[in-house]
């Protein structure tokens, strides 16, 4: 076995050789800092325009450690060391932190958090679109405790609205935009207990089609929850698990079609080819359901049947932006979370890189003069990377040392808990004996669990566009939709608004500027 001291010595030599020549010159760093300072000084000219459009990107489980690791991966995919790379979200001028706890949970789940950042109120874990007065799985605590979302506020203001996700369209994050449910797992009536059904509660897929009937764009997975039980799936005809689940016999795709005016162009699609051949100018309503359940991981995607997140976002914006009153679009990179839960860091990080690609595409189709874009996460994960790795070390590679306890190597990426806990012959598994670069490799964890857990630390909030400066410090998570509504002059945020000028800005004047900067807690 190689001596740990020899490994460290080799690592030191390699580290010195990996420093790019330009970075050895102090002028490189000074010039870079001066450019950053110049940009920061320009931010003193605040953008107080009305946000005609609002786009919210939600990286499910995209904690700060995931953002950093995704940044390195993005650079390495372009054959760079990686650490110096800038994600699209890194370019946003304003950054805040969001406190993610649920009303009854120190470490949150994705349902209670979605209610916070979409509806503006904190809620109990496992519940969507309801206040903390609703208890999980108790249908009879729902009525009277429903809360509406920024998607509803935007639709009521005449804007077009859309939902794009890589999970099921009735999963926790998107469901808080339109549903009111005591349990996030009530995907269809097949997943609901008899008591809840008898008390009149509706499943989330049903609510998607009935609560806000004119959502302009809906894209993601979740086909099977829309069809009667045992109905064969259009793509996976021989797969019993892909068949319809509904006990009430409803075909919710037909329901969706029936609610659309005949003079409007409505399209239901189920594969990538259909999506990319659409003419957005001839689409008023779009329902795209590309998988029976969640969509495929980016690394596993079928390029014929499965669109990427960025492809869905481009089409969604092309459809929504036709509305002269603007739009609200919720985009979820939902499978970042799933990759982490499975201990598959490579899957999770490639999902994060794809979401960042979608952020870039959205930026190229919109202007920060009239579009507020917010990028954040619902919660973090117990995901970390370290081990004194040298510059440019593969983010999925080994640390440059051996454990001083069991004398075995370890990967830079590790989890605090999860399915990667493995004991071989009474000892920690020797990772040099396995393919730790495999797409589905499960990184080692300290505590054995079938599913890795969320983390409880704050998450980042990146913002650009009108009123983005109002996301500026450490906030409660439910503050986020209030800022978006204020910027767009929708919902309860109309008092400060005035007819827009040709540039789309708020009426000028010190009084209105002062109001824009006044603590929002006073206004709500």
From Swiss-Prot:
Effect in UniProt of substituting residue 184 to W: In HOPS; loss of activity
Annotated effect of mutating residue 391 to H: In HPPC and HOPS; severe allele; loss of alkaline phosphatase activity
Molecular function via GO: ADP phosphatase activity; alkaline phosphatase activity; ATP hydrolysis activity; calcium ion binding; inorganic diphosphate phosphatase activity; phosphoamidase activity; phosphoethanolamine phosphatase activity; pyridoxal phosphatase activity
Impact noted for substituting residue 478 to I: In HOPS; 9% of activity
A biological process from GO: endochondral ossification
Catalytic residues (UniProt): 110
Annotated phenotype, changing residue 306 to A: Abolished alkaline phosphatase activity
Name of the protein: Alkaline phosphatase, tissue-nonspecific isozyme
Result, substituting residue 63 to V: In HOPS; loss of activity
Sites where a glycan is attached: 140, 230, 271, 303, 430
Topology in membrane: Lipid-anchor; GPI-anchor
Effect the entry attributes to changing residue 191 to K: In HOPS; moderate; frequent mutation in European countries; slightly reduced alkaline phosphatase activity
Species the sequence originates in: Homo sapiens (Human)
Cofactor note: Binds 1 Mg(2+) ion. Binds 2 Zn(2+) ions.
Keyword entries, A-Z: Biomineralization, Calcium, Cell membrane, Disease variant, Disulfide bond, Glycoprotein, GPI-anchor, Hydrolase, Lipoprotein, Magnesium, Membrane, Metal-binding, Mitochondrion, Phosphoprotein, Signal, Zinc
Result when mutating residue 40 to V: In HOPS; 2% of activity
Record lipid sites (GPI-anchor amidated serine): 501
Effect after changing residue 417 to S: In HOPS; very low alkaline phosphatase activity; does not affect subcellular location; fails to assemble into dimeric structure
Phosphoserine sites (modified residues): 110
Outcome reported for the amino acid change (mutating residue 391 to C): In HOPS; moderate; 4-10% of alkaline phosphatase activity
Domain of life the protein comes from: Eukaryota
């Amino acid at each position: 076995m190689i001596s740990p001291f020899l490994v460290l010595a080799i690592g030191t030599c390699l580290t010195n050789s990996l420093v790019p020549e330009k970075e050895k010159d102090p002028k490189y760093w000074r010039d870079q800092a001066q450019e950053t300072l110049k940009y920061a000084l320009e931010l003193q000219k605040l953008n107080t325009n009305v946000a005609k459009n609002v786009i919210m990107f939600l990286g499910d489980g995209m904690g700060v450690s995931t953002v950093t690791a995704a940044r390195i991966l993005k650079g390495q995919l372009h054959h760079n060391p990686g650490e110096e790379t800038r994600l699209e979200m890194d370019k946003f001028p304003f950054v805040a932190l969001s406190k993610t706890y649920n009303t009854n949970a120190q470490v949150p789940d994705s349902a209670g958090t979605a209610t916070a950042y979409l509806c503006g109120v904190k809620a109990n874990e496992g519940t969507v679109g309801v206040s903390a007065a609703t208890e999980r799985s108790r249908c009879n605590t729902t009525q009277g405790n429903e809360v509406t979302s920024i998607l509803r506020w935007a639709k009521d203001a005449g804007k077009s609205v859309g939902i794009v996700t890589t999970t099921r369209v009735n999963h926790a994050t998107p469901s808080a935009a339109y549903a009111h449910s005591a349990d996030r797992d009530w995907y269809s009536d097949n997943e609901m207990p008899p008591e809840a059904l008898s008390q009149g509660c509706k499943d989330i897929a049903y609510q998607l089609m009935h609560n806000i009937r004119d959502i302009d764009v809906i894209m993601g997975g979740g086909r099977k929850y829309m069809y009667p039980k045992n109905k064969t799936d259009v793509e996976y005809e021989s797969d019993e698990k892909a068949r319809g689940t509904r006990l009430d016999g409803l075909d919710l795709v037909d329901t969706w079609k029936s609610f659309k005016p005949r003079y409007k162009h409505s399209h239901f699609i189920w594969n990538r080819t259909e999506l990319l051949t659409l003419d957005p100018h001839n689409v008023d309503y779009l329902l795209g359901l590309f998988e029976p359940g969640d969509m495929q991981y980016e690394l596993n995607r079928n390029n014929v049947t499965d669109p990427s997140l960025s492809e869905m976002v481009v089409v969604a914006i092309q459809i929504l932006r036709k509305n002269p009153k603007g739009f609200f679009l919720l985009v979820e990179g939902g499978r970042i979370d799933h990759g982490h839960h499975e201990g598959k860091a490579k899957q999770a990080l490639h999902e994060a890189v794809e979401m960042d690609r979608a952020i870039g595409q959205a930026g190229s189709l919109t202007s920060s003069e009239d579009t507020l874009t917010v990028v954040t996460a619902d919660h973090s994960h117990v995901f970390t990377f370290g081990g004194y790795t040298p510059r440019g070390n593969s983010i999925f590679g080994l640390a440059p040392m051996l454990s001083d306890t069991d004398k075995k190597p370890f990967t830079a990426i590790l989890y605090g808990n999860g399915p990667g806990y493995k004991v071989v012959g009474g000892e920690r598994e020797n990772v040099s004996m396995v393919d730790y670069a495999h797409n589905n490799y499960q990184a080692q964890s300290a505590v054995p669990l079938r599913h890795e857990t969320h983390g409880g630390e704050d998450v980042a909030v990146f913002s650009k566009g009108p009123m983005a400066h109002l996301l500026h410090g450490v906030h409660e998570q439910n503050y986020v939709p209030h800022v978006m509504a204020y910027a767009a002059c929708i919902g309860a945020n109309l008092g400060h608004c005035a007819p827009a000028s040709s540039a789309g800005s708020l009426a000028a004047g010190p009084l209105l500027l002062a109001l824009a900067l006044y603590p929002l807690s006073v206004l709500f």
